């Protein structure tokens, strides 16, 4: 077993029962191993595409095979693959590279796929001109609490063409005419993972006596 790469002269000496010897020499070339390495998208939310970039190097040959294992039962032989995970979680990703001397090396890294927040809200039914209160009841996904982010942004669209609400989880708005309005809320957590939800808010017409 050679501990270093290089060119070695191997000698085989054989001796028979009469003490006679013979020998043979051969040149043994020990190549350096390729060094597997890769990078990937920093923050990945469920549904995002994860891009992997091969950073492997080899000083004594050419890498000609890439074996990726994404840790969820899916694989690829592309140099720079991409993958979409079906579930949040922590995945062990491996890249094994092989060069034209059949030398191999493996790199292993952890990829975290974060869950998107669960978006929801409530609203009071009011009459025209009154103020309705919109309350975000959105939460982080408790099933994946160890990797889920904390919601820190709320984007409201009141559905009446009068712009967007302030970045608050509880907000008030007055509608100038009756009807159902489709209100949209987008919540975003500290990792940039977001979810959108829409629901109807009802504004009643005034009764004229």
Feature names for model-found ranges:
Residues 1, 60-84, 147-173:
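Surface-exposed, flexible coil segments in extracellular/virion-facing regions
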Residues 39-44, 121-127:
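Short beta-strand segments of immunoglobulin-like
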Residues 24-29, 107-112, 197-203:
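C-terminal edge beta-strand
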Residues 17-23, 75, 101-106, 164-165, ...:
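Short, exposed coil/turn segments at beta-strand boundaries within extracellular/luminal domains
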Residues 207-209:
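Conserved small/polar residues in nucleotide/adenosyl-binding loops
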Residues 48-58, 130-144:
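A short beta-strand segment in extracellular, disulfide-stabilized domains
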